Curated annotation (Swiss-Prot):
Chain sites annotated for binding [4Fe-4S] cluster: C12, C96, C197
One MF term in the entry's GO annotations: metal ion binding
Name recorded for this polypeptide: 4-hydroxy-3-methylbut-2-enyl diphosphate reductase
Top EC category: oxidoreductase
InterPro entries for this protein: LytB/IspH
Keyword Metal-binding listed: yes
Binding site for (2E)-4-hydroxy-3-methylbut-2-enyl diphosphate: H41, H74, H124, T167, S225, S226, N227, S269
Signal peptide start and end residues: none
Cofactor(s), names only, from the UniProt record: [4Fe-4S] cluster
EC numbers: 1.17.7.4
UniProt source species: Aeromonas hydrophila subsp. hydrophila (strain ATCC 7966 / DSM 30187 / BCRC 13018 / CCUG 14551 / JCM 1027 / KCTC 2358 / NCIMB 9240 / NCTC 8049)
């Protein structure tokens, strides 16, 4: 059984930055450091940060006064920011800059009074944070996930309408929803550049290119990771059996029956150490040749806040 590794895979610049912010805050200020929501959606990463002294909470009322709090890579609503400010909490913002870009687009629409449509998954922290950027009561902010949602959508003024997207969606499915929006609301305006982030796009492209070369695909990532779920769905869509796994312990030998080539990729919040443990386990189960499939090189870097830069 050959093992083919997708490229690029694993950590993106936004995840690297978010983890570095938590690690640097712990190094500079000591534990505990409070983090609102999982800083990235990966169980291994969160557990390692917990061991180092990070305390993960879902709401700010769980954070004691005079504490340091970090906002997760998924971003937060304006209301959360205002609450942190009113309590004089020291905040470090680990929101991915590409999510912040979407927040600014929604903020501009709110300020102008334009209505806005967000393409995204209800309940996802990024979606909650993005919806929470819109404050204009005279306008409106709407969430859609499918072309069927678009068909049922009613807005106040279809002539003054824009759309944005969650950054971690399926490129193909998002394109279908955008097409539906443009058909239903011919004057709708979109962002100058697609909101789906470069890392999401690149990892999906790598899976699409590789899926025809393998019989099965393992996606390393946690179940609450949106981009990891989209990778598994895409692999299945293009014809490979696909499994989403947190780590090597979840691999079942039955999955490999009759498999001559297996692909391995990792979501943007999954560290390379987990990929290497998967390779080790696959070797134990009969894997032989390990090859890196060529892919797009990534050199994007997002800096941590100046106060947290360790010299």
């Amino acid at each position: 059984m050959n093992i083919l590794l997708a490229n690029p895979r694993g950590f993106c610049a936004g995840v690297d930055r978010a983890i570095s912010i938590v690690e640097s805050a712990l190094e500079k200020f000591g534990a505990p450091i409070y983090v609102r929501h999982e800083v990235v959606h990966n169980r291994y990463v969160v557990n390692k940060l917990k061991e180092a002294g990070a305390v993960f909470v879902e709401e700010l009322d769980e954070v004691p006064d005079d504490s340091i709090v970090i906002f997760s890579a998924h971003g937060v609503s304006k209301a959360v920011r205002e609450m942190a400010k009113s309590r004089a909490l020291k905040v470090f913002d680990a929101t991915c800059p590409l999510v912040t870009k979407v927040h600014m687009e929604v903020h501009r629409a709110s300020r102008k009074g334009s209505e806005a449509v967000l393409i995204g998954h209800a309940g996802h922290p990024e979606v909650i944070g993005t919806m929470g950027q819109y404050e204009n009561r005279e306008g409106g902010m709407y969430l859609v996930e499918t072309p069927e949602d678009v068909a049922k959508l009613k807005v106040k003024n279809p002539d003054d309408l824009c759309f944005v997207t969650q950054t971690t969606l399926s490129v193909d499915e998002t394109s279908d929803v955008i097409d539906a929006l443009r058909a239903h609301f011919p004057k709708i305006q979109g962002p100058r550049k697609d909101d789906i982030c470069y890392a999401t796009q690149n990892r999906q492209d790598a899976v699409r290119e590789m899926a025809g070369l393998v019989d099965a695909m393992l996606v390393v990532g946690s179940r609450n990771s949106s981009n990891s779920n989209r990778l598994r769905e895409l692999a299945e869509k293009v014809g490979a059996k696909a499994y989403l796994i947190d780590d090597a312990s979840m691999i079942e030998a039955d999955w490999l029956a009759g498999v001559e080539a297996i692909g391995v990729t990792a979501g943007a919040s999954a560290p390379e150490v987990l990929v290497q443990s998967v390779i080790t386990r696959l070797r134990e189960l009969g894997g032989k040749v390990v090859a890196e499939h060529p892919g797009r090189e990534e050199n994007v870097v997002f800096e941590v806040p100046p106060e947290l830069r360790i010299l």
